[in-house]
Structure formats: structure tokens, C-alpha cells
């Protein structure tokens, strides 16, 4: 079968296609193609998403890359098309260093919270509960996708004191989180 992998990334896809290819190959299958698509980096503790023009340009670039990837997949084109990948040993080290970034103690909610529960509903790892109509992180770690921060209608969820001025991002092509 034609098995393909796609890594979306903001600054680097790291070695994620390599990790996944190793897993698939350990199950007796081969990976036909690997792709990467540069997208808006939503890690707002570092990246600023407040410049709409810059975000729109990057989204247009992403849309073109998605079209190119779709064409290659439709033709079942084999190959490694991953750009900006990092060596496995670098990613292994980086993963150990960044473990502390996944601590939910970095996340906090301010008084703008209206208790809508969207953060809890949208958390992919069920790390958030609502207590007295406010989010409380019930796991010590999460995947730190920051979906809670980006979806909050009042921008009441922050990562330490690093995200207040960096904005929120919702992909314009996604209308449902189901």
C-alpha cells in the first residue's frame, strides 16, 4: 500500500516523520512518502501571532504547499519531501530539554474567563476540568497544543506571562473541532 506521512510545523518538523516511519516499519510496513507543510507557529510563549498580514501570508503559503502535497499523494509519488528536518539525536535531546514546557502549572486563567467550558471540551488529552465555572488543569502535563488558549473567546488563558501580547490563532479552514 501507498503509506504517506505529513508533518505540519511552524519552525521545524524536527524528526517526527522519522519517528513515525520507524514505528510503521517495525510493524512490517514501509513508508512510501514523507511530507512537511510549513504553517503558522501557534506556540505563542515564543511566537507572536498579532500581525495579521504576516499570518495571512503564511497561510497562503501553507495552502499552496497543501495543494502540492495533495497532487503528489494523488500520483502516489514516493520520496522524502520533508523540509527543515533535524537529525534524530538533536530531537531526542530537545525532547528531554522541553519536558518541563509541558507542565500544566505554566497555564493560568484570569478574571476575563466567563466559564463557557470550551477549553475543557476541546482539550485533546482531557487535562482540564471546570470547577466553580473556571478551568482547572487536572493533569500535571499535557501535550501543550495550546488549543485552550487559542480557542478561549475572552483570551483568558495564558502561558505564564509570555502570551498576553502574542495573540491567538484559529485556522481559517477549520470550522469544527470534532
Task: Show the residue positions of the predicted features.
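Active-site-proximal loop/hinge segments that shape catalytic or ion-binding/gating pockets
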Residues: 169-177
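Iron-sulfur cluster-binding cysteine motifs and their immediate structural context
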Residues: 108-109, 114, 118-137, 147-164
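FMN-binding flavodoxin-like domain, especially the glycine-rich phosphate-binding loop
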Residues: 1-97, 167
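A mid-sequence, solvent-exposed acidic-amphipathic segment
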Residues: 85-117, 121-124
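Short amphipathic alpha-helical segments at helix-loop
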Residues: 50-54, 101, 105, 134
